[in-house]
């Protein structure tokens, strides 16, 4: 059984999917079950992976890590996502970009931030 906003990855081709509508079936890609990614806060380099949230005049700014995460071709943050109530905001990033993004979410509201590193996976 899948749940809304879960993230799955294909360990063969690298496809990543986010569940929009939960269902009873198993997600399969390349003839293999997809791996459920579990966001973490500790492990390899938390100082470069844990999102840091700051208030701005129009919402929040999310920076990836207390120490800015590398944004190189072979190691970078692919996206930053904020889930606030029934809204999902996502900023796709590319090598060379700054590992940060701004979102129109009030700091006082209830929200969740997560990021995806192409090497070290999902973080919150």
UniProtKB/Swiss-Prot annotation:
Fe cation 2 binds at residues 49, 69, 75, 117, 120. It comes from the Archaea. Its cofactor is Fe(3+); Cu(2+). GO terms for biological process: removal of superoxide radicals. GO terms for molecular function: iron ion binding; oxidoreductase activity. Fe cation 1 binds at residues 10, 13, 29-30. Binds 1 Fe(3+) ion per subunit. The iron ion 1 is coordinated via 4 cysteine residues. This is Desulfoferrodoxin homolog.
